[in-house]
Amino acid sequence: ALHFTEDIRTLELSPLVEHVLKTRVLYPDAFVVLWASLECTNFSKAKGGQPRDADSRTLAEHLFRYIESINPDYIQIENVEEFMSWGPMNEEGKPLSTRKGEDYTRWVSKVKSHGYNFDYRILNAADYGAYTSRKRFFGIFAKNGLPVIFPEPTHCKEGKRDLFDDLARWKPVKDVLDLEDEGTSIFTRKKTLSEKTLERIYAGLIKFVAGGKEKWLLKYNSIN
């Protein structure tokens, strides 16, 4: 196996190309898969109204030299849902709502022009047995003639068992919470938390604790 720690934008690809060529000779029936979990901070809605880093938002553009160098059979992309909204920004570094998705559409078309079919899904981790409800974008590019297949869910929010489905109920996070571990008090820290962090903690207390003990226990004992 090869491991690189260099910046993907400037990585010298010769060792990778040589490794892929040798692998194709040794395992002629194997598929070469290029997986890219592109940095998502500057796409995510968690960024709020803050300016975006334009360079971070163009990391997907750097995939093309990998595609052209190793000619993968599959390219698989994982990112936040907002990746599909990738588009130009104004001078203040904020996305232009009128051109939302423009760069994403162009990028998908450019990858497809290298001989790939494409499909995507928005998948929820909870639907596959994770202890968190987290949606993510998954895109698959496949060389023409190769199938594009997404996994079938194993769980759903309320559970479903009938002639057509056998889906377990979402797993409640309480199963993996250690409520005996209270952590370290924010009031005894040597370094004071930032104002933004304190604001987030306060918002969480209002949302999840302010209703009182009974309301909190109801939340804890449910999957909502």
How should each PLM-predicted stretch be described?
Residues A1-T10:
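SAM cofactor-binding core of SAM-dependent methyltransferases
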